[in-house]
């Protein structure tokens, strides 16, 4: 019997501007995102789902989402998006209408895969840096998880509901992390919770569940620091291979330095 597997590629924290020459902490996000998407097309041709886990834009302007959509091109149908603290929900609904659930204010998603489900949750609070899972989103997540209690599930969200052992970043994570983790307790099928926001790779295992973060495709932050420090490691993205039997592998792929 042939094992059916699905390749999910996650990029995070694009921080795009409408102006392609705009810089953020010494890098041009426009160039970085274009390089990342080109690398994924060349090296991950088996990509079935492309997840962008928040901070698609930095300036929160509608034209910036149009720029990103043009970069993604014919891969838009396989793309799934959730907002970060720098995003603008209405623009995401408008520009990516065919991949965003129209009847919800939140920008979230659910997708059934062979042997797995993936969920994307909206943790955006307009005008603030930390995140939160609101009442409506908690109920939606509960309903989704209750519907398929035996299906291994991968949850994406922007703000980590766990410590990344970096004090200044832990202060701007998910405000109501305890509520979210309590919500997950009756649902052991949630095998992985994977986030962005912190601009570096992190992994923690606990309670038969893996907690991950994925580096930015733009600027990298040095982990385990008291204050924000830029790291010199290359930008990257994460790849998941989700197998029909419920097993999986994941790794972070780093981009070669621009030159």
Segments from the language model and where they lie:
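N-terminal active-site segment of His-dependent metallophosphoesterases
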Residues: 1-67, 71
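Active-site neighborhood of phospho(di)ester-bond hydrolases with catalytic His/Asp-centered motifs
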Residues: 10-12, 48-55, 79-85, 122, ...
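Short, basic/glycine-rich phosphate-binding loops at helix/coil junctions
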Residues: 13-18, 47, 116-123, 160-163
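Active-site environment of divalent metal-dependent phosphoester hydrolases
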Residues: 16-20, 58-63, 85-93, 126-129, ...
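Short glycine-enriched, charge-decorated loop/helix-capping segments at active-site entrances
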Residues: 22-28, 127, 166-172, 226-228
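His/acidic metal-ligating clusters that form di-metal
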Residues: 35-49, 130-210, 246-249
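Extended active-site neighborhood of metal-dependent phosphoesterases/phosphodiesterases
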Residues: 62-147, 152, 176-189, 207, ...
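A short C-terminal boundary segment appended to hydrolase-like catalytic domains
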Residues: 238-259
């Amino acid at each position: 019997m042939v094992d059916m597997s699905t390749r999910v590629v996650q990029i995070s924290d694009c921080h795009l501007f409408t102006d392609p020459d705009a810089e953020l902490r010494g890098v041009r996000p426009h160039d970085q995102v274009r390089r990342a998407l080109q690398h994924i097309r060349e090296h991950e041709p088996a990509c079935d789902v492309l997840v962008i886990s928040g901070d698609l834009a930095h300036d929160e302007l509608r034209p910036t989402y149009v720029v990103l959509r043009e970069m993604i091109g014919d891969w838009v149908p396989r793309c799934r998006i959730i907002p970060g603290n720098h995003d603008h929900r209405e623009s995401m609904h408008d520009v990516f209408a065919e991949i965003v659930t129209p009847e919800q204010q939140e920008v979230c998603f659910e997708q059934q895969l062979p042997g797995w489900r993936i969920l994307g949750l909206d943790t955006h609070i307009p005008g603030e840096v930390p995140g939160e899972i609101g009442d409506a989103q908690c109920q939606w997540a509960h309903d989704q998880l209750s519907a398929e209690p035996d299906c291994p599930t991968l949850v994406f969200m922007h703000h980590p509901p766990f410590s990344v052992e970096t004090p200044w970043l832990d202060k701007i994570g998910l405000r109501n992390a305890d509520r979210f983790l309590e919500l997950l307790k009756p649902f052991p099928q949630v095998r992985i919770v994977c986030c962005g926001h912190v601009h570096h790779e992190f992994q923690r295992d606990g309670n038969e569940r893996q907690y991950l973060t994925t580096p930015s495709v733009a600027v990298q932050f040095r982990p385990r620091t008291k204050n924000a420090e830029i790291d010199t490691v290359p930008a990257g993205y994460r790849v998941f291979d989700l197998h029909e039997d419920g097993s999986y592998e994941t790794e972070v792929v780093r981009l070669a330095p621009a030159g």
